[in-house]
Amino acid sequence: MHSKSFFFPIITILLSFTQNALHTKDEWKSRTIYELLTDRFARTGEDYKTGCDLSNYCGGTFKGIQQHLDYISGMGFNAIWISPIVLNKEGSYHGYHALDLYQINPHYGTAYELKELIRTCHKKDIWVILDAVPNHMAPDVPISSINPFNKDEYYHDYCVIDDENNQEQRENCRLFGLPDLKQEHPFVKEKYLEWIEDIIDDYDFDGVRYADVPYVPKWFWKEFSQAANTYTFGVISSSSSSYIADYQNYMDGVGNYPLFYAMKEGICGGSMKRLENYLFSQHKDYISPKFNVNWLDNHDNARFLNWCNDKRLFRNALIFYFFYEGIPTFYYGDEQYFNGGNDPNNRENMFGFHYSDTDIYKMMKIANEVRRKYKVYDEDLVQRYADDYFYAYTRGNVLIAISNAMNLQRNINYHSFDEGDKLCNKLKEGDCVYVIVGNININMDGEPKIYVKE
């Protein structure tokens, strides 16, 4: 570890931690992630409903998260992805406008409280993901006030990205006008590589998520990932699997935006054949899809229920992506049917909404149990049936069936089960089918099905 100690050195003396056990991508593929915004998930102390200005801080804290870890683990999730932790420009509740890499955002809490959160997570077998943002620093502040990049020479000259297909512009110009760091500058490179290594050591983070990946040179991500020395994944907002797949050469996984777009087009108002087309692209392009991160909702896009106001289709989409190849990430509030639109409306506060009796909460608990018990994450995905209204795939002895229509019946004859095998739907008691003359006859009632071999 480098000589720099973060924030309050005495805290390291006061707290007793086990040595950081860095986790490989193979270890991470068995995990399921609950993504939350630190400012929006839970406040310290009493939990009651209240409104807030979604464009500013609402009051969520590290301690608030800590007090609701049982809510997260009760749903079956064993990893959390929290907001970027460092001091930000005032008003930047989301954490993506860093002002000082060596101070914790006081709105979230103290360095001690962050360490307490992570320590408590580890006691409950919950891993914690650090969100890293080495593309830029805070906008509209004097460069001299930014630590440690307080000189103009640490930034690219001002230019605007007017062509998102121009990689040189992406890497050297300003994303949304944000001061673009010059990663090729020796000081910038050295400080950020030291920072990622030290902050993981000091706080015992288990994995790292990268923001704004295509706006940073690939060679930097390679060195950054080596310094992190744990599981890393990055987000690239593109529908092209061939474009984002190359980034797996520089980090362990990528956020699966192409799958997100395929679900959006195929499940709500389109054809399920769109999912089939994506599967073929995935198998052709990715080094390994099992290390990618999949989601239905996230903090950058309007929620599913905002553009597709159908809870039944929402449940189908959740089960489809959750068992798909990759590490599933569930966005906070989906279990409460949040339906916010574009940023910041998709970043609702969840204060007073930690209900564990909703049907989505219960459904995801079952889904997590099945994924873990049957070690689905080790199995390849095999498509078994696809048409405009129905889609089915297996991973080992688990058969997933979804539909974008209400009532339909399908016979699956391409499968790996034996004659007479009994398959039961874990989401509905008594919903069992048998393999008869090589066929699995499935009757869909509009709800997703998780069949397992009994």
Regions found by a protein language model. Give the residues of each.
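Cleavable N-terminal signal peptides of Sec/SRP-targeted secreted and luminal proteins
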Residues: F7-L15
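Active-site-proximal helices and loops of the catalytic beta/alpha 8
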Residues: L14, I118, H122, E194-W295, ...
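Short acidic/histidine-rich active-site segments
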Residues: Y331-Q336
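Bacterial Sec-dependent signal peptides at the C-terminal "C-region" and cleavage site
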Residues: L15-E27
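Bacterial N-terminal signal peptides that target proteins for export
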Residues: M1-F7
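Substrate-binding/active-site clefts of carbohydrate-active enzymes
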Residues: T24-T32, L37-Y203, W219-G234, S241-Y243
